[in-house]
Amino acid sequence: LAGRDVYLTIDETLQHIAETSLERVVRESGAERAMAILMRPETGEILAMAAVPFFNPNRYQDSPAGHWRNRAVTDVFEPGSTFKVITAAAAVEEGVVSEEERIDCGQGSIQVGSQVIRDHKVFDVLTFREVMQFSSNVGMIRISQRLGKERMEQYVHAFGFGEPTEVNLPAESRGILRPAAGWSSRTLASIAFGQEIGVTPLQMVTAVNAIAASGYLMRPQLVREIRAPSGELFSKFEPEPVRRVVSRETAARLTEILVGVVDGGTGTRAAVAGYTVAGKTGTAQKASPSGGYSKTDYIASFVGFVPAYRPEITALILLDSPTGDHTGARAASVFAEIVEPSLHYLGVPPELDSGVSSVIAHWPRQKTLASELSSGNQEWSSVTPAVAGPSIPGGIRVPALYGLPARDAVARAIGMRLAPKLLGSGWVVGQEPPAGRLVGPGTRFLLILGPSGATGFEDAVRIADDTRRGGQSPVPQRPRETPAPSEASF
């Protein structure tokens, strides 16, 4: 690939949104680390892959060696209750349970071999739908026993566990999955609710994405195309369905069940105004160094997709050892925080009449890993905000965006319900209308980009014209040292 330009599926603005939210939740929760992966359901394209703490590959020596790896593909964790999505999909596909069938949850406990497994709450009888909604371990164990270990193993493999996703990132783990022949008397029950199996974050989001993709397991895609410096196309990577894992009908039924988790179950904090969300929480005990499971350390996670019936984003949020609230509900709130502005940025129209719709958050300008690698060097087309908030008396006052990198300027403009059009690459050196003018929602907002420190409208237009004549710059560029622009205050 020497000398060639690699175009990624990563969207710099979505990466920035994810990194900003993860930094905040790590700071506030005291979590050891946090991860977020956003995927486009129908193609498997990875739109964002963020981890905190992260490191700058230009200055890797400034970070501990443990931060150098891409934990989304190298680190293995027991998923906990998010894995119930896989158990439920297998059970529905095999016809061993129906949504309204009543399941005996044994007053919150069940004997498996010589051990007693308990629920987080005492449940007597729940429908299968409620077993998922309220995340009953006992109920899922009952259902897994109907499947049996051979069929359970078949579906776990079909959803991509126990093998690399082949995303072509270095050191990708295949996870941990023992052959069914070596399962103990408890293994089937444990796997049903996400124990005794090790998965990578990318495996988990890819598996649940199969439900969003109408039953197809899609190969995760990180590279869109490779071009020569002249612009000649060298390689183009198309979406790759790996296999169908469940029928379209099963995927639709699972979607309805997962919508119930967010509407009135353990995942209510994942709700996004104006959109139907489908997803599942997970609260997984971490393994204890002395054996067994820790009583104090947990991995909180949420995986889901939105809009539920016409998905545009599948996302996984993972928080490692947060203090205080260590449940999947905490991860669900981060899911909503990341997904809501992402939907608006992508121009996904709301599907529900929920009164006043939210708009994209006013993301503060921060120096992120994405900005270090690309410095905002991308020529953009216009982006039209799909969601308008309430009318502002007297109109919208145009913000001053001078000095901001492209991604932050776009987020800020959409947050103000303006329609940005960008010319050139780099930082904002000119804008029209000017700052302070009152305009209506949806007004076209021209942002002219150039090198940090450039001034003057004429120079900005010349820079933009030169950029257009020279062609589009790939994102991200090869890592290089770039001085950061001065901090902007707004």
What would you call each of these model-derived segments?
Residues L1, I10, A36, R40-S81, ...:
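Beta-lactam-recognizing serine transpeptidase/beta-lactamase-like catalytic domain environment
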Residues L1-R33, F55-N58, S63-H67, F237-P241, ...:
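Extracytoplasmic/periplasmic proteins that interact with beta-lactams or build/remodel peptidoglycan
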Residues D11, Q15, M204, T327-E340:
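Short, charged, low-complexity patches
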Residues L22, S136, V339:
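Short amphipathic alpha-helical/adjacent loop interface patches that line ligand
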Residues G30, G95-V96, G160, G347, ...:
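Glycine-centered loop/turn motif at secondary-structure junctions
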Residues G30-A34, D104, P220, L422, ...:
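Short, small/polar residue-rich loop motifs at catalytic or cofactor-binding pockets
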Residues G274, P307, I317-D320, A329, ...:
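Ligand-recognition elements built from short beta-strands and adjacent flexible loops
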